[in-house]
């Protein structure tokens, strides 16, 4: 389901850093590697792209899909790289999940060369994503407060002022934050719900979901998202803040 949510944001994120042939780029919290794979062609044979994630299962998928990238398992708050190791660092939809986002940003700053470029994307407030907003309300009613809280955390860094502040506090300069909108597409509201509950954030946490609770959740979300149903499936807007900065 990665294409449904993330792929359309990749060119926007990479445009912010304007990769050049021969450069070294680090993709922090790379997941299955969609950003890193796209970057390979931009840095060319003389460049080098590294994708880092703390989740070994995600990296296994990434390795199978992107042999031209160096995949590393590691912690964004303690990057296993030397100071000034990269020309560019990017992070797509990972910053909000780090236990200490400030520490992760300081680490990104450390591994960049002087004048290095950094770009990050984080979702705006959950109200800007009707699909996830409806899902979170349903989770609260049918699964529980813990599940709803985990879903809300995906949108937990949705304030542009806060994003700018933590970047500047980490030592970044020339910080620019802008808001963008894209459309997330799924075959149906049911598959969207199942993907999030069983295969995305909640699926990696151990939160137990009973069959009858999931069925009730699917019915509620399907009803709430009828205004966003199209002939080819579900399509709802999502908004993100994209920030660019330099060391």
Give short role names for the model-derived ranges.
Residues 24-79, 88, 103:
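Class I SAM-dependent methyltransferase SAM/SAH-binding core
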Residues 102-117:
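A short glycine-rich, Lys/Arg-flanked "PGG" loop and its adjoining helix->strand segment in the class I
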